[in-house]
Amino acid sequence: MRSMETISPSYGTSLLYYHFDEKSSVHLAETIRLAINQSVQRLIIVLLSPEFDHSQHEHLTSKWDWIQNILVLAYIAAAHVSQDRDDPLFDTDVILVRDSDQAAQHLAHERWDAVFTLEGVPAPKALVNASHDTVSLPAACHTQGSTIHPLKLVTREGKRKIYSVSALGGTFDYLHSGHKILISMGAWITTHRLIVGLSDDELLTRKANKQYIQPITKRTASVAAFVRMFKPSIECDAVAIQDVYGPTAWDPSVQALVVSSETLGGASTVAQLRSERSLPPMDLFVIDVISTSSVVLPERGTAALRDAKMSSTYIREWLARKEGSQEK
């Protein structure tokens, strides 16, 4: 195993293997920063905990807030590093597993060049072969001047419902951290099938820098591949939609709708249409990245969090600027 003190190579794709609990949660953001700084294109973050056992269906929704906090902590930490080095296309993926064997199942279709672990933690045999480098990261990482609170396991009270079929929607252009938080949470509560509606190309003609929008075939493939990696035990129906409703307008099997706080208004429109068509109501799950992240991230303020550049619009603007500078 190589130590950071002796060598600082750059790897195309790296994998961070991290045992997650309340104590280690305060070090996660800085550990992610160190791993990304040794990675060129992509970092796969494997977080391990017995609490991530998603086969216990009755506990999935009760852990909603805690799981959301974990994903926000990891993804926004990664987004800030990508922003600092002006690389919004750097790809970060987070998976939640109970052990290394389950991680290997989730990552069966993925490839990586190096495995990062904390000092004293051996790289798991299930994720390492002769072609991989293994790198040891400092076990106690703190960022000067930051306040990061431990993430305690908090569960929701009340009836623990099981959702066989859930739905969510969006453009999902250049699948970024914000998208992945939304999709991951939808997959987390789902036990059988996740429907992901993607705005068809015809709906995006008024978007800024529309020439850089990925075609619908690319976007649907990216979503399906991400769900397969995050939770391979469920089906993913990634489908093009021509309106804000998609399959929720006619599919009676949908039990839950997952939205962001920015698209909450559209959820009420969908609920009204289903009522008019005598379709079963859907339970609503809302993700609020800003309010959640302020609990666990360094105290950079709401404005700084909004500037984390987790948007497809920003990525297209970045691509346009990059192309413009190359033409000069």
Language-model-derived ranges and their functions:
Residues M1-K328:
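Nucleotidyltransferase catalytic core that binds NTPs
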